[in-house]
């Protein structure tokens, strides 16, 4: 896909987190292939009910236990595991900011990612962008 003026696009901001992976079908691969980084907003799924489902998910908890981190740090590490993704998590305290900062050094293993993929599968077809 050719996009006129794409050389002027320095970054694209989209909703992206473990429970909202629609952009991984075609948008994120196109962006990666064209040198357009993703700025992921809501990487911690700060949308109440959805966030609760993610942090309580057994796969997320297993990965957290494996690394000795919190489920929220797993969510942020997932968003950051692609080198072309930056994240803008909302933080309401110094403690949250520090936990988020530590997440940048967490390296999820291929087993971790496979476990998360099983629990939250990649899209198999184009889906509308989520609007949480």
Model-based region annotation:
Residues 1-132:
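Beta/alpha (TIM)-barrel catalytic core signal, keyed to glycine-rich beta->alpha loops juxtaposed to Asp/Glu
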